[in-house]
A protein has these predicted regions:
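Electropositive polyanion-binding surfaces
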Residues: 184, 190-191, 217-224, 231-666, ...
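Charge-lined substrate channels and their catalytic hotspots, especially those that engage the 3′ end
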Residues: 1-287, 294-340, 378, 678-679, ...
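Classical nucleotidyltransferase
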Residues: 663-670, 683
Length: 729
């Protein structure tokens, strides 16, 4: 970088980072000024930039007031992920960096979730080891846990085992909590080398036995916004109950076309409706009409800011934490039957064989004819219920044509390699007291597939349209899995006896692999007892899908362009997509940059991940509660994971996972064979590996820690991998 002595040079973060990138050592402030061609009068301005960059982890300040890039000083910026046993890892923010193991001693004062700077101290066979040298940002601001009293003090034992320290509560900050109650403690002082964290009680949730506290635990543990600001509520209450007629101007009127919604029985917010017509040339015209939320929610309003903060709606078995107040999500933006609603429509035209031949997007007005459910559509189309077919006779041609188009779209997606995990999902049934009454397999039928195919088609069409226009946009991306993850999964699946991913069946180099390779695995395991377990393991080997301002394609869908357009009531990215699409359609200037969209994409990806983890955990909590009165009962299950200390078994139908500890296997001494992913008895050579069918007995259920211990009754069947291994079971 040439040195220019010009006072009018604009100072920027990229300039500073570029100057540091060109040096092999950390720089003093005066050296940075010199390299940027700035006089010492700009010192304060530069110092503020450096402080902001250091706080953001882009640069690191070291002894002697020198500044440098972390990558040039063997330093890593990342997030701490701790383990209940006391150690942890730093997950680097930089793409492609491997995780760093941190021993308990080297975690120092860092807590789970903190954003830190770590130094790599050594590189061993199993990977990098290091230590935390600086905490950039504290993630944990409050702790949910059990309130306890000792002789002279009180404390909270965190409910999350990854928070390794108890939180000390001074006498005046207990809010009169009683021992063993579940409370929320706000941290007032973070741990130091000599002292535990300190806090004050802000909420008393109740006793652990009360099922009603489960949603409250999750809300506070994941810090889910669950109360709307008064300003947001006021804006929602001021919305009209029906759209005024003058707002129909400039919209395509689709009220004459049979239109309906298809959702679950318990759904309340209907934001997508579908219609279909035969084209004159024998093809079909599919209309996917999405609630025009952006018409009512303007940028930078209280409603908009609240929705952006939440990012997404969160769904529990007994309630939802919506992104918008009910006046909007269940009323003016909800596509109720037999009322006019404003929508944004994707009109997709297809040949008879499912080949898309054209697309149009436009603001529209619709009137849904019916609120159908997945069950109703299944009974009409698959079970041919005569009474229902008579009742919905006027919609029957549309439903039959949709089923036909769905099969063609699905066939085409499969041919291009789209991965359909089709995992059975658990559905928790609660009684009036909030206790788990049953855990059942959620239904997935032709009606689900129809809506799924149509929404995917609309999302892809919007992404391709916007990319062709060349404007800034927000995409839904799913990057290919890492080579290491592919290699590990290949070894695992081959060890189980499956041939799909052996080197002679493709995947010789990671660059060769495509979704089709994984699709072959799913086809090979289909119908086998271990199908669900292998699907889960394959899913875990994939990267997370996320939002991005760069179109990197969607690996799982085998799509070169994808976005989220179809759910603006419950996903904020869809609302952004609607706004951008409408700006392009109206030929207005798109006023946001790629960088601005990138920042929004990062925030919304994080909010989605928090919501998914919260939803997953509350399901797990209810499933464990379901098992607590099943002590001594026997169930059939599948070995879902094997470790040195035992193996995990997932029960069939109820989707509950528990541990058979190796110490409970008294018939032999079992050793873990890491390369074979199994436990083998020294004397009997009996094996336990993933996919084995097992009958187990429920021995212990710890509701608070969500741990279940099983005892083995018998091994029912061998997994595929036992064949030809020379090991008897």
């Amino acid at each position: 970088m040439g040195i220019q002595r010009e006072e009018h040079i604009d100072l920027s973060a990229p300039q500073i980072l570029q100057a540091m990138a060109e040096e092999d050592r950390p720089l003093l402030l005066r050296e940075i000024l010199h390299r940027l061609g700035l006089q010492k009068e700009r010192r304060q301005e530069a110092r503020e930039f450096l402080r902001d960059l250091a706080e953001g982890g882009k640069i690191v300040r070291i002894r002697g007031n020198r500044y440098g890039l972390p990558s040039k000083m063997n330093l890593i910026v990342g997030k701490v992920k701790t383990h209940p046993d006391g150690y942890g890892f730093v997950i680097p923010e930089a793409e492609g960096e491997e995780d760093i193991f941190i021993s308990p001693r080297n975690l120092k004062e860092a807590m789970h979730g903190d954003r830190v700077v770590a130094r790599v101290e050594s590189i061993r066979r199993k990977g990098k080891e290091g230590s935390v040298i600086r905490i950039l940002e504290r993630k944990t601001r409050k702790v949910v846990g059990k309130f306890m009293r000792a002789k002279n003090y009180s404390y909270v034992t965190p409910e999350d085992e990854r928070i390794l320290q108890e939180v000390f509560i001074s006498e005046g900050e207990t809010k009169r909590a009683r021992p063993n109650q579940i409370v929320v403690a706000e941290i007032t002082r973070y741990p130091t080398g000599r002292a535990r964290p300190e806090g004050r009680i802000t909420h008393i949730l109740g006793y652990p036995d009360d099922p009603e506290i489960e949603p409250q635990i999750i809300i506070h543990k994941y810090d889910l916004p669950h109360r709307f600001t008064s300003a947001a509520l006021k804006e929602a209450q001021n919305l009209p109950s029906t759209p005024p007629a003058d707002e129909y101007k400039g919209r395509v009127d689709l009220r004459g076309i049979p239109t309906f919604t298809i959702d679950g029985e318990n759904a309340r917010d209907f934001d997508d409706a579908v219609s279909i017509e035969r084209d004159k040339d024998g093809g079909v015209k599919l209309y996917v009409s999405i609630s025009d939320v952006s018409h009512y929610v303007k940028e930078e309003t209280a409603l908009d800011n609240e929705a952006y903060s939440r990012g997404t709606s969160v769904y529990f078995p007994d309630r939802a934490i919506p992104m918008f107040p009910t006046e909007l999500s269940n009323e003016i933006c909800c596509l109720h039957p037999r009322v006019d609603r404003l929508t944004l429509t994707a009109e997709l035209r297809y040949e008879r064989n499912g080949q898309r031949k054209g697309v149009q997007f436009y603001p529209s007005v619709i009137r849904s004819d019916e609120r159908l459910t997945y069950t109703l559509v299944r009974e009409i189309l698959l079970e041919e219920d005569a009474e229902l077919k008579r009742k919905f006779e006027y919609l029957l041609p549309s439903l039959e044509l949709m089923a036909e188009l769905c099969q063609e779209l699905r066939r085409r997606r499969t041919e291009r390699g789209a991965i359909d995990f089709d995992l059975p999902e658990p559905e928790v049934i609660l009684n009036l007291q909030g206790e788990t009454e049953d855990v059942i397999r959620a239904e997935r039928n032709l009606a689900h597939q129809m809506i799924e195919e149509f929404m995917i088609a609309a999302n892809e069409a919007v992404a391709h349209f916007m990319e062709d226009k060349g404007f800034p946009f927000i995409y839904r991306i799913h990057e290919p899995p890492k080579k290491e993850a592919v290699d590990e999964f290949r070894r695992f699946i081959s060890n189980l006896g499956y041939k799909s991913m052996r080197p002679d069946h493709g995947l010789k180099r990671v660059a060769d692999h495509s979704p089709k390779e994984f699709l072959r695995v799913l086809s090979e395991v289909k119908g086998r007892p271990e199908e669900r377990v292998i699907n889960e393991i394959l899913l875990r080997s994939m990267k997370w899908a996320k939002y991005s301002a760069k179109n990197l394609g969607h690996f799982g869908l085998a799509s070169d362009g994808y976005t989220h357009f179809t759910s603006p009531i419950r996903r904020y990215p869809d609302l952004i997509v609607h706004r951008l699409l409408k700006q392009v359609l109206s030929e207005k200037e798109v006023k946001i940059s790629d960088e601005g969209l990138g920042n929004k994409a990062d925030h919304l990806s994080e909010r989605e991940r928090v919501a998914m983890e919260a939803e997953r955990e509350i399901l797990n909590r209810y499933r464990v509660r379901f098992m607590r009165d099943k002590i001594g009962e026997e169930f059939e299950g599948i070995v879902s994971g094997v470790t040195a200390f035992g193996f995990f078994v997932e029960l069939k139908d109820v989707f509950v996972e528990g541990l058979v500890r190796v110490t409970s296997l008294h018939d032999d001494y079992y050793q873990y064979h890491e390369k074979k992913y199994c436990l083998i008895g020294e004397r009997t050579h009996k094996t336990f590996r993933i996919g084995d069918e097992i009958r187990v007995r429920v021995d212990r259920v710890d509701v608070e820690r969500r741990h279940i211990d099983f005892g083995i009754v018998e091994k029912i069947g061998k997994g595929k991998g036992d064949a030809g291994t020379g090991v008897t079971g």
